Structures are given as C-alpha cells and as structure tokens.
From Swiss-Prot:
Phosphoserine found at: 346
Family: Belongs to the G-protein coupled receptor 1 family. Adrenergic receptor subfamily. ADRA2A sub-subfamily.
Source lineage: Eukaryota, Metazoa, Chordata, Craniata, Vertebrata
Gene assigned in the entry: ADRA2A
Organism, as annotated: Sus scrofa
Region described as Disordered: 242-377
Protein's name according to its UniProt entry: Alpha-2A adrenergic receptor
Length: 465
C-alpha cells in the first residue's frame, strides 16, 4: 500500500519515499555510535518528554471518552435505538487505534527506528490502515442510514432492526479489511543507513503509485464524496419540507407523520388505514384553544419536544390507539370532564356518542391518548433531526482532521515534495479525531449528555433516560 522510508510509518498510511531524508541524518537514520554506544535519538530529551506526555493524554482521553460512549448506548434507554450500534462500533475502532496503534507510532517517532520486530510491523501497519478505513466507512454507512430513514421513513424503519444494523456493521469491517489486507502481500524489510554502518530496523510497505492513489481513493476520498452528496440531499429534503406548509405536503412529507398517516382535508386528523402496516393510523392532535389543525401543546413531560421515554430514533411503528392505563377509572372520568370542548374552540360541539365525520367516536381519554402519542412522535422527530445534525458534525470534523493528510500523501505519490515535519503534523492531527467524537456527542446531543452525567455522577439515583 504505502511505503515508508522513514524508520516506520507513524500510522495508517506510511510516509512516501519522497519524504526520505538523506542518509546519515540522525533524525531518521540513527545508528549505533562507534564503540557500541547508544543510538542517536531524533529529538532532545525535553521534546521527547513533551511528545510522550501529549500522546499519552491523547490515548487516555480517547479510551476514556469512547468507553463512556459504549456504556451510555448500552445503559441509557434514550440511546438504545438500533442505529446507535454504529456509534458503538465506531467508538470501538477509536479505542483500538488508541491502544494498538498510537503507542507504537509514538515509540517509533521518539526512538527513530522500529524496535518491535518484523511480525508486529506487519500487524501494526495492517491494523493502522484497518482502523482508519473502518472509521470513515462507518461514517459513510451512518450517512446512508440517515438518508434512508428520511426518504423511506415507513419501509426502512420497519426494517431497521438490531440484526440488520449488525449485519451492516460486519460488512463495514469486511470492506475495511479488504482495503487494508493487500499491503501485507508486498511488505519488505530493508536496511537503512549507508556505508559500513549497522543496519537500522525498518518496516516498508508497498509504495507503487497506483496502489497509493487507489488506496487513498478507496479509504478516504470516495467515502467522503458519498457522505457529502448524501448530506447535501438530506439538507435539500429538509429545506423543501420546511418551506411547504403541512396542508400542501405530498406523500413524502406524509411519511413523516405518525405511521405515515395523511392529514384529512378538514385538518382535524389523519384518515385511518392510510400508510399503515398491520395497524390503524393514529389520530393527530387538534388544537382545542387555538388555530384549527395545529397540534396541541405538549405537556410538562414533553417539554422542549423531548419524550424521555422513547429512544432517540426508535422504531416508527406505533401501538394501536386505545385508552391509556393511567386514564382508567375515576381519574379518567375527571380528565374527560376537564377536557370537554368549550365555546369558541376549533372543534364543533357534538352530542354524546356522536361520531365525527369520517372517524369513529372516541372518548375524551382516547382523544387525549392520541394527543400524547402525537406529542411523543414530535419528540421522536425532533430527536431524529438533532441526531442527523450531530452526525453531520462528526463527519465534518473527521474530514477536517484527515483531509490534510490524505491530500498531502496523494501529492507525494505524484512526485510533489512535502516537508517531513508538516507531513507528520498532519498525520498526528488525524489521530486526534479518535478522541473528538465523545466531545461532539456531549456538546450537541442532550441524550448523551444526560447519560454521561449519570455514568460519572453515580450519586444521582435518577433513572437514565
């Protein structure tokens, strides 16, 4: 795949031959001093300690943050949606980078040569490419998942099961392995240094131009292009739906309603049996003291459009409508009396038991149950939007972190010269991406923030939601 002429690649894609320093440069070709003394090191003691401390903090923060993400997804009810398994797999890849790749890249950097032998050199290079590639292929799969959940809301969400998501994750890792395996076929070991000096341990990998370019395209540029196009399309769909009034939206917009139900021409709710699979469509709320056709305001439990009992992107198939347990008995009767329509309301008065036009009669408790379910749906839709935004930020940060490295590496493949210091900076800047996703989740996602707080503050006995 990529050939490293320095003592060894510092990561996923080893530096090209164009970055090879001249022979005898101690920064890259330190050898035994005359008389069997110690090898020269690339950096001074102060610089070495600084690099070790910074890389150590990066590794600790990466492992800690991504372990929190995994625990949060498996323990928080608000994060148990099947598609969050993508985030678990992505976090696992970042943890593996911090534990199996960065430590050896750091040792190679500060020592100036490869110390760990031929076998681990092969494994190290393959794992480095594997984990980096899997990260971007994960993000590509996540972006496609978001696109399908928006454009095929009913059909796709019925198919979005944990088993299906796990199958996609396995496919992601297989694709990544296919990309990272070929370098093992052409890895060679060569001696460094010149003259009669003892050879320095080196680990070199395929540096053929066609392979370098094709690997960069397959590992970064092609998935990146797919993600950008998909999110542009998602943005266009969201913008179009925002501009079109609800009463004029077509079938695509209707798919965003609970169960894919369409609103009746009179604006009072959906027609039953429309767009449902195996269950009746559920009634949409009606504003009792406001403009007709507008949803009723959410209760205290649904403040900020957030239903704490539902997952961030839970399945869109609702339970059939019916009275809620909490509304049976005397309490339900008192609620029914309190919810009677008053003069001036947007709904016409009806006699007891008189069914509305085009819909069977419902009691006050059942009507309130429909309002609550529609409110939960609004909360779920709001979470879908926030989740899509968070993933867009994750993808954007990944591109910002890794694009400089892949761009400069592609330049080296076509013969352009890149300063070694700049090249190494871009590579380590890419490593930093592994630690940033937990920070992004904390800043932009309310559910992750609550889950992290619960995990870190065990004194709070409130249920994780």
């Amino acid at each position: 795949m990529f050939r490293q002429e320095q003592p060894l690649a510092e990561g996923s894609f080893a530096p090209m031959g164009s970055l090879q320093p001249e022979a005898g440069n101690a920064s890259w070709n330190g050898t035994e001093a005359p008389g069997g003394g110690a090898r020269a090191t690339p950096y001074s003691l102060q610089v070495t300690l600084t690099l070790v401390c910074l890389a150590g903090l990066l590794m600790l923060f990466t492992v800690f943050g991504n372990v929190l993400v995994i625990i949060a997804v498996f323990t928080s009810r608000a994060l148990k949606a099947p598609q969050n398994l993508f985030l678990v797999s992505l976090a696992s890849a970042d943890i593996l980078v911090a534990t199996l790749v960065i430590p050896f890249s750091l040792a190679n950097e500060v020592m100036g040569y490869w110390y760990f032998g031929k076998a681990w050199c092969e494994i190290y290079l393959a794992l480095d490419v594997l984990f980096c590639t899997s990260s971007i292929v994960h993000l590509c799969a996540i972006s496609l998942d978001r696109y399908w959940s928006i454009t095929q809301a009913i059909e796709y969400n019925l198919k979005r099961t944990p088993r299906r998501i796990k199958a996609i994750i396995v496919t992601v890792w297989v694709i990544s392995a296919v990309i990272s395996f070929p370098p093992l076929i052409s890895i060679e070991k060569k001696a460094g240094g010149g003259g009669q000096q003892p050879a320095e341990p080196r680990c070199e990998i395929n540096d053929q131009k066609w392979y370098v370019i094709s690997s960069c395209i397959g590992s970064f540029f092609a998935p990146c292009l797919i993600m950008i196009l998909v999110y542009v399309r998602i943005y266009q769909i969201a913008k179009r739906r925002t501009r079109v009034p609800p009463s004029r939206r077509g079938p695509d917009a209707a798919a965003a309603l609970p169960g894919g139900a369409e609103r009746r021409p009179n604006g009072l709710g959906p027609e039953r049996g429309v767009g449902r699979v195996g269950a009746e469509a559920e009634p949409l709320p009606v504003q009792l003291n406001g403009a007709p056709g507008e949803p009723a305001p959410a209760g205290p439990r649904d403040a900020d459009g957030l239903d704490l009992e539902e997952s961030s992107s839970s399945e869109h198939a609702e339970r059939p409508p019916g009275p809620r347990r909490s509304e049976r008995g005397p309490r339900a009767k008192s609620k029914a009396r309190a919810s009677q329509v008053k003069p001036g309301d947007s709904l016409p008065r009806r006699g007891p038991g008189a069914p509305g036009p085009g819909a069977p009669a419902t009691g006050a408790g059942e009507e309130r149950g429909g309002v609550a379910k529609a409110s939960r749906w609004r909360g779920r839709q709001n979470r879908e939007k926030r989740f899509t935004f968070v993933l867009a930020v994750v993808i954007g940060v990944f591109v910002v972190c890794w694009f400089p490295f892949f761009f400069t590496y592609t330049l080296t493949a076509v013969g352009c010269s890149v300063p070694p210091t700049l090249f190494k900076f871009f590579f380590w800047f890419g490593y930093c991406n592994s630690s940033l996703n937990p920070v992004i989740y904390t800043i932009f996602n309310h559910d992750f923030r609550r889950a992290f707080k619960k995990i870190l503050c065990r004194g709070d006995r409130k249920r994780i939601v």
